[in-house]
């Protein structure tokens, strides 16, 4: 494989927070773990989803029509569903494996639902819920919250996550496509850290920095992980990048400055 995934993700990161071709971006992230596997068939699968939903768009008059069309295609014809048998399987956050197995985490499936919904002319955004990842669909002035992990079912108000209840509706807001991609990668990173695999966590953090190079907290995490595995020069550079991006006086800036000073004393 050429450097296409890295080049693609670098350009994506430099372009800002989106909207992006989010499903393609998720595939490119997965391709970094499968350098010998051709991406073309997976991109063709995304194109088929897009073409099918575009053909349905004229029939989508209300957001509920669109939600049903998504369910019929993704859950019905294609068989996508949440992996309730082995939720923590790392393949559930690897978009290539998700396409192969038709199983995934809420955020991975959500990316496919976002891809399909946008092809049909709807607005689709992930929501910043702390628990289960859900999507908000909007069309012609109406909106609906759906759960990709459970077959794309609509979530009525009684069963909304706490952050989305009517009396707390302002607590959960739509997030950028970059935030959704970071959430996907963070699932893998947390599993790596839980398994004590610092090298894997470091590689995943590099990818997160690639798609969101303006985020100081990611540079801080990259510095800490580099330091933990003994790559001190890279840790120093990452602390400096964090300081360049974090506003002076903020806790993150102060902590990075202290740790950088300590690291420089070790390097001298």
Enumerate the language-model features and the residues they cover.
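A structural boundary/capping signal
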Residues: 1-268
């Amino acid at each position: 494989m050429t450097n296409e995934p890295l080049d693609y993700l670098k350009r994506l990161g430099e372009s800002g927070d989106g909207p992006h071709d989010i499903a393609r971006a998720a595939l490119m992230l997965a391709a970094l773990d499968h350098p010998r596997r051709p991406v073309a068939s997976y991109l063709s699968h995304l194109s088929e989803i897009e073409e099918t939903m575009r053909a349905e768009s004229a029939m989508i008059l209300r957001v509920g029509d669109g939600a049903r069309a998504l369910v019929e295609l993704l859950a019905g014809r294609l068989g996508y569903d949440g992996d309730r048998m082995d939720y923590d399987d790392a393949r559930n956050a690897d978009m290539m494996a998700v396409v192969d197995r038709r199983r995934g985490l809420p955020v991975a499936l959500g990316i496919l639902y976002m891809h399909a919904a946008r092809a049909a002319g709807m607005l689709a955004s992930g929501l910043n819920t702390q628990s289960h990842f859900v999507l908000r669909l909007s069309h012609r002035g109406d909106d609906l919250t759906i759960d990709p992990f459970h077959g794309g079912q609509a979530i009525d108000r009684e069963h909304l996550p706490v952050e989305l209840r009517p009396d707390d509706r302002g607590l959960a807001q739509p997030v950028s496509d970059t935030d959704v991609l970071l959430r996907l990668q963070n699932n893998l990173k947390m599993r790596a850290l839980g398994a004590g695999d610092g090298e894997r966590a470091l590689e995943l953090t590099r990818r997160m920095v690639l798609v969101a190079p303006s985020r100081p907290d990611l540079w801080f995490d990259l510095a800490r992980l580099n330091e933990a595995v003994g790559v001190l020069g890279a840790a120093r550079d990452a602390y400096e990048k964090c300081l360049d991006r974090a506003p002076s006086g903020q806790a993150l800036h102060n902590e990075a400055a202290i740790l950088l000073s300590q690291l420089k004393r070790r390097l001298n």
